[in-house]
């Protein structure tokens, strides 16, 4: 899931794959999820290696596209995980780490986009937030390495610098725009004050 956190491209990349490719985001691609080999083929196209982590997602835990990708990734030394709503599923058996949510029956039988989909999204948010914290992209409860992609985020970053350093708005914003991130602006300012 894309976020506002500016993860350095050499350190943390995320890539989402879906059975049926980009088309499947808007239209059904019949049979795509039943191809047990295609998931791994797509991972290879994205140059997967043993430094990566693959997280398979399927509410049922029985989707061949995901199972095949996890099986082959693990065979090639890639750390694998999965998120499913079906305990002891075939997908969980192929993952190094299985997250098996208990969500109970869906309100509309078979509509896994409801409780299962919501739970999966929450877990992905927790994983990506934890990664950003471990990479030092978060200070306290603030994203200090966010992408300055719009006015709202520039203003948010400016306020963070103002709070942290006690600077006025103009000075804080100039630092932010000069250094490209809240973290870099704060570090540069503190360094300049010490030297």
Regions found by a protein language model. Give the residues of each.
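Single conserved hydrophobic/aromatic residue that forms the stacking wall/gate
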Residues: 1-8, 12
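Gly-rich Lys/Arg/Thr-decorated short loops/hinges at beta-loop-alpha junctions or inter-strand turns
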Residues: 16-26, 139, 154
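Ligand-binding beta-strand-loop-alpha-helix segment within the catalytic cores
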Residues: 21-53
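Short glycine/serine/threonine-rich phosphate/pyrophosphate-binding segments
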Residues: 50, 60-69, 91
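Short, well-ordered beta-strand core segments
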Residues: 54, 80, 98-100
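Surface-exposed amphipathic alpha-helices with a cationic face
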Residues: 70-75
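Short alpha-helices
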Residues: 84-141, 151
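Short, amphipathic alpha-helical interaction segments embedded in low-complexity terminal/linker regions
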Residues: 131-195
């Amino acid at each position: 899931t894309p976020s506002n956190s500016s993860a350095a491209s050499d350190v943390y990349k995320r890539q989402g794959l879906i059975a049926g490719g980009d088309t499947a985001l808007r239209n059904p691609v019949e049979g795509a999820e039943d191809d047990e080999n295609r998931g791994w083929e797509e991972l290879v196209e994205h140059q997967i290696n043993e430094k990566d982590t693959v997280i398979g997602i399927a509410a049922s835990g029985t989707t061949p596209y995901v199972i095949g990708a996890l099986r082959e990734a693990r065979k090639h030394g890639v750390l694998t995980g999965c998120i499913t709503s079906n305990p002891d599923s075939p997908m969980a058996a192929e993952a190094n780490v299985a997250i098996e949510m208990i969500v109970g029956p869906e309100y509309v039988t078979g509509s896994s986009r409801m409780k299962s989909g919501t739970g999966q999204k929450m877990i992905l948010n927790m994983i990506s937030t934890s990664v950003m914290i471990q990479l030092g992209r978060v200070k306290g409860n603030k994203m200090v390495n966010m992408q300055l992609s719009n006015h709202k985020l520039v203003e948010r970053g400016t306020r963070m610098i103002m709070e942290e350093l006690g600077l006025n708005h103009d000075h804080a914003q100039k630092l932010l725009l000069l250094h490209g991130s809240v973290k870099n602006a704060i570090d540069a300012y503190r360094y300049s004050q010490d030297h």
